[in-house]
Amino acid sequence: MEKILEYLMEKYQPEGMIVYGSFADGSYNENSDFDVLVIASGEKRHDASVVDGTVLDAFVYPPEIFAGAFDPADFVQIFDGKIVLDSKGVAAKLRARVLAYLDALPLKSMDEVRQDVAWCRKMQSRTLRGDAEGFYRWHWLLTESLLIYCDARRWHYFGPKKALRQMQREQPGHFAAYRTALEDFTQSALSGWLDCLEESMDS
């Protein structure tokens, strides 16, 4: 990461940088991009250069963007990022604005969650048909139920990677059931996962 930061410093002379994604939380591997928001004078741009064998996903914004009105929803990806440079305090203010926005986001009502969980059981019955459509619905259910699980737990959903890590950390038994449903692809494993979903709704 040091060489990447050196490259960004030399090229953009930034006043702020927020690293987010896998390089911020330590989950990166050899295939990971380096996600970073750079605050630097000049025009807005995207840098996808390869530095030290790592592909950059660097979004460069002039500080003027954050001095006026902007939509924090456009920057939610940095909510748990690491501020590695902030000479004028703009990066800290940006992250605080994003966190305030996320705190104010409404969660689904429990009635809505119950309807979604009922949809999961209904969808499970449609996976029994044994044809291409049935298998499509099976995959669809496994994907969509992760979002519904987050709603049931009263978590905001920030993509599968963060959702799975949070589930593994806070609900390891449910994580094991979901992983089994994904890997085994059997009706019994699917039922076990949906049982966890219903349990979360009632907790």
What is each PLM-predicted segment?
Residues 47-132:
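Conserved NTP/Mg2+-binding pocket subregion across the NTase superfamily
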Residues 33-34, 42-44, 48, 59-63, ...:
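Short alpha-helical interface elements
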Residues 1, 5, 16-18, 76, ...:
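Generic, low-specificity signal for short hydrophobic/alpha-helical stretches with a mild N-terminal bias
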Residues 109-203:
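Conserved nucleotidyltransferase catalytic core and NTase-mimicking acidic/glycine-rich helix/loop elements
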Residues 24, 30-36, 50-52, 65-67, ...:
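Generic preference for flexible, low-structure residues
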Residues 1-31, 37-84:
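Metal-dependent nucleotidyltransferase catalytic core
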Residues 5, 11-15, 26, 35-37, ...:
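Residue-level signal for well-ordered alpha-helical segments
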Residues 2, 6, 10, 15, ...:
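Glutamate identity and glutamate-enriched acidic tracts
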